[in-house]
A protein has these predicted regions:
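Carbohydrate-active catalytic/glycan-binding domains of CAZyme proteins
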Residues: 1-261
Length: 261
């Protein structure tokens, strides 16, 4: 609507002392910054006074605190939430009683306020003793066809091994005041054992029905590949048959394997 691209990314305040900070202190000093663009190629940092410096100078910080660790912004359904922009942020272990995913709303993509004082998801929503880890980049999408919000969460099963990391999903009809559906696993039906789904998003397509895009992560070699789904539940790697989806953009540009995260 605004004909602008918004890019949100995590930062730390300049007061961080990496050598002497404990983990909880670092989490509290994290911030979320924003950059905008008219073409999606060249971005600039807006001068905002939401969180100015100690000298009163503007910054491009739009959020701070533990939930800035994975503050994810998306377009919500305006009629259901009253906000054009919705964001979620997960807290994991900073304050045990507060562990969960919190919901925020904004009219302009810059000024975010909590939509609820309590988290919309906590560890009590998990099926068993192996809880979701709210420190990951959990993602949300509004599904206009099904009229539900999808929430994808990282989860560790009780079996050791990197490949046992998995992604779960649940749905809200009302993400502000409603209750979530039971958690269920997202499946990869043609991937090798050492890939798990990460960073799922719903993409609207003009040529076909909307589809879901995921970027699976592999261990111990950190490589990104492409996975696609029509239902948001079962994903395939489209290497064998790309006609039903789109070409995997990582095949030729991935480069040599790397052990860096």
């Amino acid at each position: 609507e605004s004909k602008k691209y918004f890019m949100y990314y995590r930062c730390f305040t300049r007061e961080v002392d990496y050598a002497n900070e404990d983990e909880d202190s670092l989490k509290r000093k994290q911030t979320t910054c924003v950059a905008t663009s008219n073409d999606g190629i060249t971005f600039s940092r807006p001068s905002l006074h939401i969180y100015p410096t100690k000298n009163g100078d503007p910054t491009n910080i739009i959020h701070h605190g533990p939930t800035a660790h994975n503050f994810v912004v998306f377009h919500g359904d305006l009629q259901r939430t009253g906000k054009r922009f919705i964001a979620i942020g997960g807290v994991d272990g900073v304050i045990p009683a507060d562990s969960g995913i919190y919901l925020f709303g904004s009219d302009d993509g810059f000024h975010f306020d909590p939509l609820k004082d309590s988290p919309i998801l906590t560890k009590k929503h998990n099926r068993d003793e192996y809880h979701s880890y709210f420190d990951s980049m959990n993602t949300v999408s509004w599904d206009t066809n099904r009229e539900v919000y999808w929430v994808w969460l990282r989860m560790n099963s009780g079996v050791t091994g990197y490949h046992r990391r998995q992604t779960q999903y649940l749905q809200f009809e009302d993400i502000v005041n409603g209750n979530p559906s039971p958690l269920a696993d997202v499946m990869m039906i043609n991937a090798t054992f050492n890939h798990y789904v990460s960073c799922v998003s719903l993409v609207a397509s003009e040529k076909s029905a909307s589809y879901f895009v995921a970027i699976p992560i592999s261990f111990p070699l950190y490589e990104s590949v492409l996975a696609l789904s029509r239902d948001g539940i079962t994903f395939v790697n489209p290497k064998e048959d790309i006609s039903a989806y789109i070409t995997d953009p990582f095949v030729d540009s991935r480069g040599p394997p790397t052990y860096e995260n």
